[in-house]
């Protein structure tokens, strides 16, 4: 057993006595922030398991439920509580019934939602038949297709434009910028041109694509790569399929967080940095006020710093390689 495993063992002992009930009381909406401007777009009330919950328009169901003190979205086959996992719509851990349809609440806005409930054997079956729709499928043609509108994808788009090549960028999110949208700190001068040094991450995200966003398809996901240099894309907002034909394909889909396994790593209140940053900096929701950070690298320190900006208290930063 290595030192990291020993440290995780200590962490498991700490989490063994963790109470989700305690964390429920200290989840809150962020109303003041020293860096970010918090928009006020009105409120919307929906029913969650029969109880009224009010959330901010333009923000997700997950944010509304956590702010209302409901971090549990599902249960395992053994009855264990389940909560957010990736927080960016990739894993399906937060799937719930939203007005009768299965949706991932970490990316589904509260706007116009009437009822949300946990998916159970009693309230959901897969016997329903989907009627095929005979609709013409649009085909877009370009030089290069780019999957991902984060820093890498947008940098590729910019370079291709300088070379005189056309491109189409496809991203499943509702905004461009990827992880830069979650970063409130000022970046160092890390590139030769010194274009972005000193700028905060979310400001870099606004400038990466310039003023011309043509050829960028948001709310869309690539679900198949076909023959004849064609990819199949689903417009998740309008529920339509379309094709993109390109001479080359660039995959710039970013990364997903790694969660080392330890006892009770699935307890609501134990989250990856990606979930914490997304809920905090994009959804203005603190998942807790008293924080223990596991990992003292770049991400651990930055997330802890951002949590302190948002009003949380970081009690300790846990290093797996510490003596």
Regions found by a protein language model. Give the residues of each.
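Short beta-strand to alpha-helix junction loop
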Residues: 188-205, 322-323
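Rossmann-like dinucleotide/flavin-binding elements
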Residues: 132-172, 255-322
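FAD-binding core/adjacent interface of flavoenzyme oxidoreductases
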Residues: 78-81, 100-145, 201-290
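Short hydrophobic targeting helices and cationic amphipathic motifs
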Residues: 5, 11-14, 18-19, 65
């Amino acid at each position: 057993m290595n030192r990291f495993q020993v440290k995780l063992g200590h962490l498991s002992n700490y989490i063994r006595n963790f109470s989700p009930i305690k964390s429920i009381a200290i989840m809150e909406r962020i109303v003041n922030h020293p860096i970010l401007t918090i928009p006020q777009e009105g409120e919307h009330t929906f029913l969650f398991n029969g109880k009224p919950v009010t959330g901010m328009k333009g923000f997700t169901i997950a944010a509304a439920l956590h702010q209302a003190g409901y971090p549990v979205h599902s249960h395992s086959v053994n009855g264990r509580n389940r909560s957010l996992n990736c927080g960016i719509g990739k894993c399906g851990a937060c799937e719930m019934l939203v007005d009768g349809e299965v949706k991932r609440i970490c990316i589904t806005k509260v706007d116009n939602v009437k009822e949300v409930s946990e998916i159970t054997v009693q309230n959901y079956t897969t016997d329903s038949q989907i009627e095929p729709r005979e609709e013409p499928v649009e085909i877009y043609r370009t030089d290069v297709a780019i999957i991902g509108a984060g820093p890498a994808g947008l940098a590729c788009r910019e370079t291709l434009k300088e070379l005189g090549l056309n491109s189409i960028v496809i991203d499943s999110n509702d905004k461009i910028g990827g992880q830069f949208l979650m970063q409130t700190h000022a970046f160092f001068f890390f590139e030769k041109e010194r274009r972005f040094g000193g700028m905060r991450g979310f400001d870099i995200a606004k400038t990466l694509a310039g003023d011309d966003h043509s050829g960028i398809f948001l709310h869309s996901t690539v679900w198949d790569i076909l023959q004849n240099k064609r990819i199949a894309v689903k417009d998740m907002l309008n529920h339509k399929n379309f094709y993109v034909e390109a001479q080359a394909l660039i995959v710039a889909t970013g990364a997903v967080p790694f969660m080392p396994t330890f006892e009770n790593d699935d307890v609501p209140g134990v989250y990856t940095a990606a979930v914490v940053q997304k809920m905090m900096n994009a959804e203005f929701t603190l998942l807790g006020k008293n924080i223990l950070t596991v990992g003292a690298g770049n991400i651990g320190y930055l997330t802890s710093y951002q949590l302190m900006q948002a009003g949380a208290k970081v009690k300790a930063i846990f290093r797996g390689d510490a003596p």
